[in-house]
Design a protein with these regions (language model features):
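Catalytic-site signature segments of enzymes, centered on catalytic residues
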Residues: 49-52, 111-194, 238-254
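Short active-site loop at a secondary-structure junction
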Residues: 22-32, 46-102, 139-149, 247
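Active-site-proximal alpha-helical segments within enzyme catalytic domains
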Residues: 105, 151-158, 246, 250-272, ...
């Protein structure tokens, strides 16, 4: 593997050997790991270490940090009704749902009927108005289902009602600029030269079963899952329009360094000053749901408030860990057990989605070393 950046603390030398043997068909990848506030791994292959790419649902971790900042600053109460901040949300008997319940994927708003259009996705107010008017696809709180796309407009409208700013504006001012990190929700045009477009040359499935995901039923078999999936063209999310807009749920453009820097800024591991009140992050990262996900049609899924939680299906950390993975293989998480922050980006698309399991041995090794010291 052609490395364009090669720094590994000697204590974590095993990580380098694993990284060098990750799938040879990757267009490019980056990996940055911090332990107790110190960078112990900074690796890149086939892309510049400062290049950025679309990280899809890893964007949700950046948005969750933004909401946690509002919680810590006393501007947002997760146990307040969503309709308290956003009265129109009360339509179709949604008025008693709390912010925490809505943003832990329990509201039944994984899609609208009719579907959101590509144009609406890049107009948060249009998308949020459609979601406020939508009758839930299932009885809220009776089950949960991943609001893969729609949680973006839900978060954005909430932030707008509280601050008067879009979530992208608030994140830029309060989070990204403060962390001085290459992790954008809306990447400026002058930085486009540093963007590595997502490769669509080859689909590489993480479980090796390409035939399975080529079948019509694919990896969404339930009616809810079929209706919730495939609402928006992929080109809408990964094109310049998507990169410029920065949909809070799916259009972040980041480097692995940038991801790790934002998370480290937020948590302040290693005795640093946390940019977000620790109790707010702890509250948002507490597990809210676990089990069968209606929208993904998968078992063993779990979420806090926006943040994804590790399970046996996605074992990226201890029960205290929180973060989010992305459809093309990227991952960002923090684990207070060992004070680990990991950012990983991949510049290619693969199904069935989620973080690239090729880095699971790295996650396991880092956790073992970090918790032993």
């Amino acid at each position: 593997m052609e490395l364009t950046q090669n720094f590994v603390d000697p204590a974590y030398a095993e990580v380098l050997e694993i990284f060098k043997n990750i799938k040879p068909d990757l267009k490019g990848s980056q990996l940055v790991i911090k332990v107790k506030g110190k960078t112990v791994v900074d690796l890149a292959a086939r892309v510049r270490p400062d290049s950025m790419t679309t990280v899809f649902s890893v964007s949700k971790a950046l948005s969750a940090i933004t909401l946690a900042k509002l919680v810590g600053d006393g501007k947002l109460n997760l146990d307040e009704r969503m309709a308290h901040y956003w009265p129109e949300f009360a339509a179709h008997h949604k008025g008693e749902l709390t912010v925490r319940q809505v943003l832990s994927h329990q509201a039944g708003l994984t899609a609208t009927d009719p579907h959101l259009t590509d144009e609406m996705v890049h107009d948060d107010h249009a998308a949020s108005a459609a979601l406020a008017a939508q009758k839930p696809l299932w009885k809220p709180l009776s089950a949960f289902g991943y609001h893969g796309l729609t949680i973006g407009p839900l978060m954005s409208e909430l932030v707008f009602r509280i601050t008067g700013h879009t979530i992208q504006q608030y994140y830029e001012k309060e989070i990204r600029s403060a962390a001085n990190a290459d992790a954008y929700l809306g990447v400026p045009e002058e930085l486009e030269t540093r963007v590595t477009p997502l490769s669509m040359d080859r689909v590489v499935t993480f479980d090796g079963d390409e035939e399975k995901y080529a079948r019509p039923e694919g990896f969404h078999n339930s009616g809810i899952a079929q209706w919730s999936g495939g609402q928006i063209k992929l080109d809408t999310l990964i094109g310049r329009g998507g990169r410029a807009f920065g949909l809070a749920s799916a259009e972040g453009v980041c480097s692995a360094r940038g991801l790790a820097e934002v998370m480290q800024w937020a948590v302040g591991f290693g005795g640093g000053t946390p940019g977000v009140k620790p109790s707010a992050l702890e509250d948002m990262s507490q597990m809210q749901v676990y089990g069968y996900d209606l929208a993904l049609d998968q078992e063993h899924r779990s979420f806090g408030t926006v943040f994804q939680k590790p399970t046996q299906a996605i074992p990226f950390g201890s029960y205290k860990a929180f973060g989010h993975d992305g459809a093309a293989g990227s991952l960002l998480y923090a684990d207070p057990h060992g004070e680990i922050v990991l950012g990983y980006t991949v510049a290619r698309w693969a199904v069935p989605g989620g973080y690239d399991r090729a880095i699971q041995p790295i996650i396991d090794v880092v956790r073992k070393i970090a918790t032993a010291n």
